A protein has these predicted regions:
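Gly/Thr-rich phosphate-binding beta-strand-loop-beta motif of the actin/hexokinase/Hsp70
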Residues: 2-29
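Phosphate-binding loop and its immediate beta->loop->alpha context
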Residues: 31-152
Length: 152
């Protein structure tokens, strides 16, 4: 195993999530890692913070999204998901940490989005929702993606 080269800070927030890194060698200041995310169904942007929202697109929208970003899954994360929460709340998971940390929550049950009648129980399983940081980090001197976060 190779020696660590970076110090990494991850904030998995209820509202926003972020990742920063700094090389262990030298005096470089930490840098926020831009996170690729959907801005609209047509555009992708890199932003320093990722809104902590998951959106399950309607069947008519899903084909427009596939193939535009590597590893696009059924669930969409970030700014587009946050925007859709106001428009179609039954298809968006928000405050997941709060729900899953509640003492009465069954963390293995398909409960999110809570109270939604817009999607079926089989679609409430978040196992397929994942966030993959930009694999082209080698351009910034990193050989591998910093991390892969999986929602289970």
């Amino acid at each position: 195993m190779s020696a660590a080269r970076f110090s990494i800070g991850i904030d998995l927030g209820t509202t926003n999530s972020a990742l920063a890194y700094a090389p262990l060698a030298g005096d470089a200041a930490p840098e926020a890692l831009p996170i690729q995310q959907w801005e609209t169904p047509e555009t992708v942007a890199e932003m320093p913070m990722l809104p902590s929202f998951l959106y399950l697109p309607e069947d008519a929208l899903a084909p427009q999204l596939r193939g535009k970003v590597p590893e696009t899954q059924a669930w969409i994360v970030g700014r587009l998901a946050r925007r859709r929460a106001a428009e179609i709340p039954g298809r968006v998971v928000r405050s997941a940490k709060s729900w899953l940390c509640h003492h009465t929550a069954d963390r293995d049950a398909s409960i999110l989005p809570w109270g939604s009648e817009d999607i079926g129980p089989d679609q409430k399983n978040l196992a397929g929702a994942r966030l993959c940081f930009d694999p082209e980090l080698s351009a910034r001197g990193l050989e591998q993606p910093l991390c892969r976060l999986r929602f289970r």
